[in-house]
Amino acid sequence: MNKRTFIKRFGQLAISVPLLPNTTLGNHPKSFHTRTVSDDFWMNIRSDYDLKPDYINLESGYYNIIPRPTLEKLQGYMRMVNYEGSYYMRTVQWDNKKNTASRLAGLVNCAPDELIITRNATESLDLIITGYPWKQGDEAIMAEQDYGAMLEQFKLASKRYGINNKLVSVPNHPKSDEEIVRLYEEAITPKTKLIFVSHMINITGHILPIKKICAMAHQKGVEVLVDGAHCIGHFEVDIDDLGCDYYGTSLHKWLAAPLGAGFLYVSKSKIAKIWPLLAEHNREPDDIGRLNHTG
């Protein structure tokens, strides 16, 4: 794998290097003492980054430094949009958004008409939490370890719609996937409508068994909203295989995309039931673009 192949994993966006063990080691045993990639490879990657000498940045989970080729592409794109003005905004913009959404859908294995580009994971997840057709007395399940902003959004939904939020606590050292699945299962009641679950818990790095949680929830008629803020670009994500109803993520973290890029996946059969944040015109109820209007 050379530098250009690495960067072209998703157009001009550089996927974070934690994906490399999956591509270089295959099914072989992993060891911290085994060198799998040469120093020349890493120096080649490093040369694409402008790194501040004052410190070593180890926090890609908040904001990942953009590689130079991506930054230059972004700057050139901004100049082009400014040069073309309203002509671009009224014409080419829509095709570019559609094509980018389609490529993202290919990256995570979902249908292009089930994915919209948003500004980040928080916006994506809030669109579902606030747009869900809640009725007073409905229940939602989430974990104490979930991202604080999302827990606050559920509190707001509780005040606004009269829903009940049920908190579970994910153990730091679970004995099995089944223990975690059972944790959520035991919190379900006939009033439960939605489970909110982190694909990767940001404070521990724990990857939860989303596929198993979704299968259990669907057997009980409960939908699942997944917070994937720390997953895209960090490891391979197959949304179709996970079987979730909704999936929101940021792309400025492990995918090293510019700030202001995220996406929301909504299962085709669920699109029509979600209320948009801002009203859109000339859209069919099952058109996911209906949820993407920002003015």
Regions found by a protein language model. Give the residues of each.
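Pyridoxal 5′-phosphate
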Residues: N2-G295
